[in-house]
């Protein structure tokens, strides 16, 4: 095996940043997406190991490849080995609780990884006959999400929110709940975000029990990071590495998987960085002409099959808050739901700070969720919308100037707003309140009771940071 690999070696002709041209012997050209390996020593004696991926065949036995790590120390004339296959990464239980880079190498220095089962990162999306065509809700146990912007099993959700409004805590709670309620696992792909954030997430996951560093197999998540200091090749492919690990849990272990991508915009950005170096003509706003194809290739692999599902939650950065920018606009075409986090709610102490009026879902249709769920959700939105409209009047004239009917709407809306808050399992260490998983049936029952007027006499403090409606009543008795 090794002798045949040794025969298929090429040499570097030119290096332009992360992109290099490599010449191979006639008749021994590597395929597109093949992984190429450069090993040796720099002039200063440092060990050199760079993995590249073939992107183009230029003719005259020359290929153009993108490096997955820094190209410092490389020179023209250095030997390059064709591995004969695409980049492959470890999959399965061995990945749980560990941190990987784009190449599937562990970076947490926490012991060896079992490389006996690996899969290539470039794979075809499931065929039509394998897909699950049933529209079903993915219950998260989080009231505001399940009622007003429900997630689709095997769907894609966009997560919008600035810094410090609770994105990380919401992500950790979802990871915790899918493990407990669905027996599923999660895969977190950190694409082009800050190293500090990745480290904070890892430490918080250890504190909250999502990662068990004494027995990794009991962990609920695998982490794959390609941070913003990495070359664009790594940031462009780290999403595929995370997706490949998630696909194994879905297809082989037959599990429900949550795939987090933070941030999907950085995946597009990395592609645009290398696009010009690959000689492609830029399209709108300087993005790569293959933007829709690259996005589609990633998103189409995220789906439900007859044996399991991958539900993906993707943080979406919107450059300059311009929703018509080609990167977010292309992402929106693939999303089934959006969860928008509001700084205004976070400042009131209402967590999770999910904006009930801005968050949307294509699943909120009466023929999918049922008439009762649909009508309750619409009534909640209507009440909150009316409260929002009345806030200017309240600020200027006060509550006393409102009609009896509007005062009742405001009272119920404030109770609804507080009842949309919920104590999280992963936040127990900060809040001191035990976490609550609220089923969809309990959620609908609770909001119907508030809107029907059954709880008009209950003080609004009783609705804050509780689970189901029974807890509201018992808390009200304690407050008396």
UniProtKB/Swiss-Prot annotation:
Its main location: plastid. It catalyses: ATP + H2O + 4 H(+)(in) = ADP + phosphate + 5 H(+)(out). SMART domains: AAA. GO terms for biological process: proton motive force-driven mitochondrial ATP synthesis. It is an enzyme of class 7 (translocase). It is a peripheral membrane protein. GO terms for cellular component: chloroplast thylakoid membrane; mitochondrion; proton-transporting ATP synthase complex. ATP binds at residues 161-168. One of its GO terms (molecular function) is ATP hydrolysis activity. Keywords: ATP synthesis, ATP-binding, CF(1), Chloroplast, Hydrogen ion transport, Ion transport, Membrane, Nucleotide-binding, Plastid, Thylakoid, Translocase, Transport. Pfam families: ATP-synt_ab, ATP-synt_ab_N, ATP-synt_VA_C. InterPro entries: AAA+_ATPase (IPR003593), ATP-synt_VA_C (IPR055190), ATP_synth_F1_bsu (IPR005722), ATPase_a/bsu_AS (IPR020003), ATPase_alpha/beta_chains (IPR050053), ATPase_F1/V1/A1_a/bsu_N (IPR004100), ATPase_F1/V1/A1_a/bsu_N_sf (IPR036121), ATPase_F1/V1/A1_a/bsu_nucl-bd (IPR000194). It is found in: Plastid, Chloroplast thylakoid membrane. It comes from the Eukaryota. Its EC number is 7.1.2.2. CDD domains: ATP-synt_F1_beta_C, ATP-synt_F1_beta_N, F1-ATPase_beta_CD. F-type ATPases have 2 components, CF(1) - the catalytic core - and CF(0) - the membrane proton channel. CF(1) has five subunits: alpha(3), beta(3), gamma(1), delta(1), epsilon(1). CF(0) has four main subunits: a(1), b(1), b'(1) and c(9-12). Produces ATP from ADP in the presence of a proton gradient across the membrane. The catalytic sites are hosted primarily by the beta subunits. Belongs to the ATPase alpha/beta chains family. This is ATP synthase subunit beta, chloroplastic.
